[in-house]
Amino acid sequence: MAKDIEASGPEAGEFSAKDYTDPPPAPLIDAEELTQWSLYRAVIAEFIATLLFLYITVATVIGYKHQTDASASGPDAACGGVGILGIAWAFGGMIFILVYCTAGISGGHINPAVTFGLFLARKVSLVRALLYIIAQCLGAICGVGLVKGFQSAYYVRYGGGANELSDGYSKGTGLAAEIIGTFVLVYTVFSATDPKRSARDSHVPVLAPLPIGFAVFMVHLATIPITGTGINPARSLGAAVIYNKDKAWDDQWIFWVGPLIGAAIAAAYHQYVLRASATKLGSYRSNA
């Protein structure tokens, strides 16, 4: 929440300085929220956004693998595919688009790790967080289901877009990659949606979705060779449910434990270091 303060003196009319106040912490359990249409509208928005996210991105992955398959035939076989760079752009670009579209309705989480991090920071209630995560997981399953329905000839052959630990990497390496990648994403979410920044940059509505989308893009470039890049438990679960192969399920815990740890670290770092909530613990004083 922000308020305008009119400038006075010779600079009046040229600009308005913006002050801001931090919103109050969300209640842990808000039963009254269950009676409000705005909650269910937000849950629907999260479901649809995650469905669209998984449909576009997994379809891109399947299409790329088909186009680069040396044994494939048909007109698509002559195409070199979008490459890892194109896959990263598909994930980052869709997050940018969907966060921009849904931020004013649900906050544009589209990711249980983001929701979990915001819950730990008391930005959303437990009720809202649980409903969001359920909607995100169901949306992801439906989105991947659409891909399988439209690309049934290629879906299973090319791995179903499922996240799996690549050969040559240990489970510890995969877990660390997911922790660090999710930390980058959730840290960016906190920074881009910080009340102080929002008050200053509210006249440019794309400034929050843009860095979040870029964070997803950059993390994919770094971690696609290791885990296929999860950083989103709903994305990993949706692909595993529809693909339903042992390898995808054996590695599934990496794509839940890693992102949730990364989100928790990012929430603590933002709240107690960058935003100086540590002053409540009496450790130091900040004018930030």
From Swiss-Prot:
What segment(s) does the record annotate as region Disordered? 1-24
InterPro entries (alphabetical):
Aquaporin-like, Aquaporin_transptr, MIP, MIP_CS
Q: Where is this motif: NPA 2?
A: 232-234
Name where it's found.
Answer: Cell membrane
Tissue-wise expression: Expressed in the root growing zone at 5-6 mm from the root tip.
- Where mainly located? membrane
Listed Pfam families: MIP
Q: Which SUPFAM superfamilies match?
A: Aquaporin-like
Topology in the lipid bilayer = Multi-pass membrane protein
For the keyword Transport, the answer is: yes
Q: Does the keyword Membrane apply?
A: yes
Looking up PROSITE patterns in the UniProt record yields: MIP (PS00221)
The lineage's top-level taxon is Eukaryota
Q: Enumerate the transmembrane spans.
A: 42-62, 79-99, 130-150, 172-192, 206-226, 254-274
Give the disulfide map. none
UniProt motif (NPA 1) ranges: 111-113
Molecular function GO labels = water channel activity
Alphabetic keyword roster: Cell membrane, Membrane, Repeat, Transmembrane, Transmembrane helix, Transport
Summarize the subunit comment. Homomers. May interact with PIP1-2 to form heteromers.
The record's listing under PANTHER family reads: AQUAPORIN OR AQUAGLYCEROPORIN RELATED
Q: Tell me the domain comment.
A: Aquaporins contain two tandem repeats each containing three membrane-spanning domains and a pore-forming loop with the signature motif Asn-Pro-Ala (NPA).
Functional description taken from the UniProt entry: Water channel required to facilitate the transport of water across cell membrane. Active as homomers. Increased activity when heteromerization with PIP1-2.
Q: Which family does it belong to?
A: Belongs to the MIP/aquaporin (TC 1.A.8) family. PIP (TC 1.A.8.11) subfamily.
Protein name per UniProt: Aquaporin PIP2-4
Task: Please give the organism.
Answer: Zea mays (Maize)
Record lineage: Eukaryota, Viridiplantae, Streptophyta, Embryophyta, Tracheophyta
